[in-house]
Regions:
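Helical element adjacent to the flavin cofactor pocket in flavoenzyme catalytic cores
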Residues: 2-48, 53-57, 61
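Structured beta->alpha junctions
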Residues: 7, 51, 123, 168, ...
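Hydrophobic alpha-helical segments, especially transmembrane helices
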Residues: 26, 82-83, 206-209
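Short, surface-exposed beta-strand-loop junctions and turns on beta-sheet-rich folds
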Residues: 51-53, 136-137, 205
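Active-site substrate-recognition segment that forms the wall
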Residues: 57, 64-195
């Protein structure tokens, strides 16, 4: 189906501007400061450097690291290493100027269980982004995010079955990202402990709903 109100969210820029907005309104942001453990009954954060902080309530939205902060989640959600590739679109060829045509294209999602992918059209100078939507259900989020060239090319090959004019020769770069997957792909938003709340299991969809 086609959703006319759909569009591209530039996550990095949105987070950056949100942080500036909150800072100007007195919200204290602990940038680049990791949390080692969370006591969700007492709302105490342990930063792992000998310091702690007690707050009113704790919301844990830690992506693929959620199981390390909340071991009780380990049987409910699984970190899943996924691949994302960026494609340079041709401006001339048998199908014409694909670079221009794709700028007004919608986001696409192919939910094929074997070779599913999503495509994000190029906006604001970005390249066409294609990601695999076939859950690996493996990987450690602390590992590097490099992707082998052959593995990245395979993602382009899956998409090329549906998208004319795109081949592995157009592959520019690739990286890995992580989903946190619940067995039935149901989002988890619920209280935990006396003063905690957890948000997890978004299967890569969390940002747009946030």
């Amino acid at each position: 189906f086609h959703l006319t109100t759909g569009g591209v969210l530039r996550a990095g820029r949105i987070v950056e501007l949100t942080a500036h907005y909150l800072s100007r309104r007195g919200v204290e942001i602990h940038a680049h400061r990791g949390v080692k453990t969370v006591d969700i009954d007492k709302a105490i954060l342990d930063f792992g450097d000998g310091t702690t902080e007690q707050v009113d309530h704790v919301v844990v939205a830690a992506g693929p690291w959620v199981n390390q902060l909340l071991p009780a989640m380990a049987h409910r959600v699984t970190p899943s290493r996924q691949m994302v590739v960026y494609v340079d679109l041709p401006s001339a060829g048998p199908l014409g100027d694909l670079a221009t045509a794709w700028k007004s294209a919608p986001m696409l999602l192919d939910i094929d269980p074997d070779n599913g992918f999503y495509a994000v059209p190029p906006v604001a100078g970005d390249r066409l982004k294609i990601g695999d939507h076939k859950f690996s259900l493996t990987g450690d989020p602390h590992d590097d995010r490099d992707v082998a060239r052959d593995a990245a090319a395979a993602v382009v090959d899956w998409a090329a079955v549906r998208l004319d004019g795109i081949t592995r020769e157009h592959l520019e770069s690739a990286r890995a990202c992580f989903y946190t997957v619940q067995d039935e792909e149901r989002f988890i938003l619920e209280p935990m402990g006396q003063k905690g709340f957890v948000m997890s299991g978004f299967s890569g969809h969390g940002f747009k709903f946030g």
